[in-house]
């Protein structure tokens, strides 16, 4: 159920502190946290949108397993290292499980799954997006906003709001695209990027 071959062994390795990340791999496996995020989102939607009652206990057990068997074994710094790899909106997934269960441990895990490399500078209004993989960054900010909704921590509201305004004002063509090759770029590159084979994209 972990979405990647050898997933249980992979996460045992991660939980032991052996973490080698880039984008898009963790210890050589393609985006394993991203895959867990997609499973959590699917299970949540199956329960809330399709009234599939059986989905809720599976959702809770999967979120509990990843939280207790992986996240709880890691320091905050190690989790931030894990978040270098594309991970979707895993923070948002954990807020959703908290919303459905009322069990605070899921909100605590959501807090630890907020990527500091993005929410801290964006909460301060800094545009640090140049060169970053757009598809990796965008879902984090829906997660930051969801986290704000359930905690009232305005730093995350500011991060999400500033992200929207910065992307709209500094990274978007009039037709709506905001990246090429799924990556943000600097203002001075707009004309050249119009001719790029993999852009404009949104």
Predicted feature locations:
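Glycan-recognition and catalytic cores of secretory/periplasmic carbohydrate-active enzymes
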Residues: 1-202
């Amino acid at each position: 159920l972990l979405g990647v071959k050898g997933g249980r062994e992979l996460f045992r390795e991660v939980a032991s502190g052996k973490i080698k990340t880039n984008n898009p791999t963790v210890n050589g496996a393609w985006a394993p946290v991203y895959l867990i995020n997609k499973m959590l989102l699917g299970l949540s939607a199956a329960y809330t949108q399709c009234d599939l009652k059986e989905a809720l206990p599976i959702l809770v057990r999967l979120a509990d397993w990843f939280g207790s068997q992986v996240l709880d074994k890691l320091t905050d710094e190690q989790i931030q290292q894990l978040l270098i790899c594309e991970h979707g909106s895993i923070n948002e997934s954990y807020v959703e499980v908290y919303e459905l269960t009322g069990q605070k441990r899921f909100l605590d895990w959501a807090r630890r799954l907020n990527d500091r490399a993005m929410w801290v500078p964006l909460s301060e209004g800094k545009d640090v997006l140049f060169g970053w993989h757009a598809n990796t960054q965008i879902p984090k900010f829906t997660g930051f906003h969801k986290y704000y909704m359930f905690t009232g921590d305005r730093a995350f509201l500011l991060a999400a709001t500033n992200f929207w305004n910065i992307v709209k004002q500094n990274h978007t063509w009039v037709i709506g695209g905001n990246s090429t090759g799924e990556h943000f770029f600097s203002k001075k590159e707009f004309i050249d990027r119009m001719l790029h084979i993999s852009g404009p994209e949104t």
